[in-house]
Amino acid sequence: MSNAIDELQAIIAELKSELEEQKTCTRNARERIERMSAEVVDSNPYSRLMALQRMNIVKDYERIRDKAVAIVGVGGVGSVTADMLTRCGIGKLILFDYDKVELANMNRLFFTPDQAGLSKVEAAARTLSFINPDVRIETHNYNITTVDNFDKFLSTISESGMQQGQPVDLVLSCVDNFEARMAINAACNENNLNWFESGVSENAVSGHIQFIRPGDTACFACAPPLVVAENIDERTLKREGVCAASLPTTMGITAGLLVQNALKYLLNFGEVSDYLGYNALNDFFPKMTLKPNTQCDDRHCLQRQKEFQERPKPVLQQVEEVSDEPLHASNDWGIELVADDAPVAEQAPKATDTANVASGLRLAYEAPEKEAVDQAGHAAAGDGMPETSLEDLMAQMKSM
């Protein structure tokens, strides 16, 4: 009996310690900032982000506060993705995961050993709220692949945007199994939501991101991996004592590529990659675009393809051809204006001029002929004073 009481008292003491720690973190957290500022001061966490406007990269960076992003999977890639978006000042983050933090996760980024035993979404929410209290964080601790939870997931991403009843602006898949990817794919096809799929290989030396626009690009069911196409149970592929390798570097790079393209999509700058891979062995970054499969097994994907085909295509503006003719062929000064890239005909120097020029050199200009110089000199003399010999000039100077 006494042992049980001692154990309970130890648990109570531990809980009190955790509560006090949370209170300390809350007291040390900065106050919320109502409006982003570009003022360059040490106390402004957004000054370097707002500098993107001054450098004409982003037109209005503060729009990021109006965006809601759902992240499914808060593991090696997902937790770093959430961290980056939080530091960027995203308006709202919705986190989905049902796993707990373990010491085996410490080789990856973000989580700390003292968070072992906490649910990943709870541990992430605590840290993210401390990093940036301006971000609204919503957590869901359940497996989205079950029948009941899938309906909850479907409802959440379609109604939990920045405004209640509005869908999220983007869904980011950071899960490590194909079953969850297929669930996200089905939900986004049904809700017609754009989303990014991401992943890291089991040998930890390659990763990828894929931007999926329902109806426009291939969904995850259009060209499924072998493990999905053959209806293989992933759990039968795993043996006790065998696990996938993981490197924080590969996961950090994949998360960086994912967030970079998510920001380009949300803030409308740069080019969003449809598919971008990464191979760490030779630093290779393949890019491609996957077209949708007209025989896809997902009926919602087929419906989105039909809607996309019926959507009016954007009309390309006709660019008028610019004439190469000079704007002013003649003028009072006899100067002809030509384009910068127009060929200039060079007159070949006379043979007498090039006779004494070394090989590889050419004259910068053509010297006038001697007869022309003499004629010009005589003409100038005739217009001015009369001709006087040198002897007469000397005599005049001596007599002065």
Curated annotation (Swiss-Prot):
Transmembrane portions of the chain: none
Family matches, as Pfam families: ThiF
Any Gene Ontology biological process: neuromuscular process
InterPro entries linked to this entry: D-isomer_DH_CS1, ThiF/MoeB/HesA, ThiF_NAD_FAD-bd, Ubiquitin-activating_enz
Binding-site positions, ATP: G76, D97, K120, N143, N177
Family designation: Belongs to the ubiquitin-activating E1 family. UBA5 subfamily.
Protein name in UniProt: Ubiquitin-like modifier-activating enzyme 5
Record organism: Drosophila virilis
